[in-house]
C-alpha cells in the first residue's frame, strides 16, 4: 500500500514539527527568565518610573529605576483606543506593562500603581498578562507631559476588548504614573 520511505518521511516530518514547536515553547519560557537575569543599567536621564517589591533585577537601592530611553529600548507598542478622559480615539505609544515586569523578573499577583500625587490603586497582575496594557509615554505622537497625564499613563486597550469598558476598571488607568510595586 504505502512505501516504507513515505511513512518514514511522514514520521520524520511530524517529529520535526513537534521539535520545532517544543523549541519555540522552551524559548518563550527561557528568554524572559534570561532577560530578567541581565543586569539593568543605571538610568542616564531623569527617572520616570520606579519598579519595586518582589522583583529580581534592580539598579538602585529602591528597586529598578527607568528613564524614558530605557523604557523605549524595551520596545514600543502603539494602540488606538478611546478613553473616558479624551476626545476621539487617540493613538498611544509606549512599552507594554508586562514587558517591563518581565524585564525586572517580577513575581506576584498584584501591582500597586502610584501616581505623582500619591494616588495608588491595586492592579491584578492578570491585567498585564491577559491584555496589552500600555505604559504610554506619547499620545497622538506627542510626548506626554505632567500637565497632559504624563510622563506615563497606564492605558488599557478598551476598544479591542469590550470587557475593559467596565466603569469599575477606570481606577486602574493611572496617569502621571511614577511607581509600580509588585506584591
Residue ranges and their predicted role:
Residues 1-14:
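N-terminal secretory signal peptides that target proteins for export/translocation
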Residues 2, 35-183:
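N-terminal intrinsically disordered, low-complexity segments enriched in P/E/S/T
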Residues 19-32:
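Bacterial N-terminal signal peptides
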